[in-house]
């Protein structure tokens, strides 16, 4: 959560996209609705990713990743792509909701450091 501490610098080119949001975009900015809707998104559903909690002010969230045979690597631990997809969806939406509807958030670059193999059900708290 280090990059949420303190002010967030947003380059001028990323500030406003000038698009009118659809009613769907306005509807999805409620944390409970987003949590239920993202649970039905096929890539995350197949990867075993589930958003289990998002705070009302979008400052905290919990994601679980269940390791299935189709999401495990040759050693039986969680495939790194499934772990990264769990973090990307939550961080991106939390930042977008905090910045407001006039902004779009895109993951331009990211890195992940694995400390130990993940097996069973993994929990990410942001």
Language model regions located:
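Non-catalytic linker/capping segments at the edges of enzyme domains
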Residues: 1-62
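Residue-level signal for pocket-adjacent positions within structured domains
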Residues: 39, 46, 69, 73, ...
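Generic structural "secondary-structure junction" signal
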Residues: 40, 46-47, 76, 85, ...
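Beta-strand secondary-structure signal
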Residues: 50, 60-64, 111, 123-125
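Hydrophobic beta-strand core residues of beta-sandwich domains
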Residues: 54, 78, 116-118
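Generic "edge-of-domain/loop-turn" microfeature
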Residues: 56, 70-72, 119
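Hot-dog-fold acyl-thioester-processing enzymes
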Residues: 66-91
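Hydrophobic beta-strand-centered segment that forms part of the acyl-chain substrate-binding groove
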Residues: 93-125
């Amino acid at each position: 959560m280090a990059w949420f501490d303190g002010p967030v610098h947003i380059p001028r080119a990323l500030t406003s996209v000038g698009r009118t949001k659809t009613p769907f975009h306005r509807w999805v900015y409620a944390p409970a609705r987003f949590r239920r809707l993202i649970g039905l998104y096929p890539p995350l559903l197949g990867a075993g990713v589930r958003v289990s909690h998002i705070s009302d002010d979008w400052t905290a969230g919990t994601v679980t990743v269940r390791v299935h045979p189709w999401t495990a690597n040759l050693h039986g631990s969680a495939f790194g792509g499934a772990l990264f997809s769990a973090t990307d969806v939550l961080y991106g939406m939390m930042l977008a909701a905090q910045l407001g509807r006039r902004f779009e958030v895109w993951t331009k670059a990211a890195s992940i450091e694995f400390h130990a193999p993940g097996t069973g059900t993994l929990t990410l708290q942001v």
